[in-house]
Amino acid sequence: MAAALQRKCVLHWGSLDFYPNLYVVLVAPSGKARKGTAMIPGLKLLKEVGIKLASNSVTRQALIRDLKRSNETEIDPTTGSMDIHASLTVFSKEFTVFLGFHNNELMSDLTDWYDCDDDWEYRTKHEGIDDIKGVWVNIIGATTPDLIQSAMPLDAIGGGLTSRMIFVYEQRKGKTVHTPFYTDDEIALRQKLVYDLEKIRMLKGDFHVSKD
């Protein structure tokens, strides 16, 4: 849902603006739970709806390039003003490969992007300064406890990037599905999900907390 909403929707909360981006990482011991398998149906839905995704294997520079190329212009339905946003979803079944080993520069960028700054400046390969308007990054990834420890420096655990992440841990599979085929009802439900995501993707503007 966050991938469909992008940076087009916002909740103003006092002096703060909240956008619907999440950093979610599925964690389980290797071979004990099917993390990547659980993610595949979601990936297919996002591609079917046309959500912009980061490249599968990227360097920091390529990721920044993907983010910059994802920019779109939207008209605010409330004010009529023109807004530019660069919304990109990272979908990585091997999240620690995506992060790299102690890649402090990329981890610092991801920490910055979580806050969805209006302008994000960076130094280019040829030492120039460029910027991206309306940064918005959304992440769903998967890894193992051991790989988290090896990929991240100790001082990153519990603060910085990891404090912005939601780690979903599972020790083992809940059950084994011997015949993983959709029933007619599930196929119909999937089509409804695609329809809902397409409608959600069209939403834009300010959201408000209801009095209820």
Please annotate each region the language model reported.
Residues M1-D212:
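Phosphate-handling catalytic cores of nucleic-acid transaction enzymes
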